[in-house]
Amino acid sequence: MKRLVSVGPEAPEGFEDFHKGIEAAAPFVKPEHPNTNDDISLMYFTSGTTGEPKMVAHDFTYPLGHIVTGSFWHNLKESSLHLTIADTGWGKAVWGKLYGQWIAGANVFVYDHEKFTPAAILEKIQDYHVTSLCAPPTIFRFLIHEDLTKYDLSSLEYCTIAGEALNPAVFETFKKLTGIKLMEGFGQTETTLTVATMPWMEPKPGSMGLPNPQYDVDLIDNDGRSVEAGEQGQIVIRTDKGKPLGLFKEYYRDANRTHEAWNNGIYYTGDVAWNDEDGYRRR
């Protein structure tokens, strides 16, 4: 017991006075105008892998951008039980634990482990009959080194993967062991699902898939020219026709970094890829 609080008319010795605490709190000021779609609804920090972390602000249209994430990429139905392995403090959590899944009417299995162990994940899938799993490639690398014959994974129907490039060997091994193809996707804290392998597409190991139709995705060189198949280019989102659902509003209180990443009708992801002959994006 660390703190005692009294709600009575007078606080006894050793107790904090609840009513005095309320009086000392800052008063709530009702906003003059109601929220609009353009107002900030949530903020997430980037991981800071390529520099200082940035505070990414999304507006109230952001959840709608995840309709494609849940209903199509995750291939969810009302009978689905989906598990995304991601810490709640990161943007990937709302990718897989909230917006797209709820909009699809699916069930969400939340498991925030203190320490990751492959066996614990497999046990949860078995015991709770998880039907859909999304995790980074690293997780699947650990899973394929377990003896999967010890677990009943018959409920598992669909698996998606994001966060880093997928090793083709992991794809092939997991498919051999489970019969399930890993469907890769790509996006950022600043976006929703941007490039992905959808259910109606044949996955190509090592490829992210094709652009999400809600984004005008292009690959450009240092001169701003769209690259040809086989050439490397930066992944960009063209916004000259308007801001697409799911794209961030700004880096909070950082106009310079916002302009640096998003200017002249183009959002620059900073990530590099190339197109194969079928238009699939590869890293």
What are these regions (language model features)?
Residues 64-81, 88-131, 146:
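Conserved AMP-binding/adenylation subdomain of ANL enzymes
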Residues 228, 236-283:
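Conserved ATP-binding/catalytic segment of the ANL
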Residues 87, 163, 187, 209, ...:
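Active-site glycine-centered loops adjacent to acidic/histidine catalytic or metal-binding residues
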Residues 40, 46-49, 82, 125, ...:
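Conserved S/T- and glycine-rich ATP-binding loop of Class I adenylate-forming
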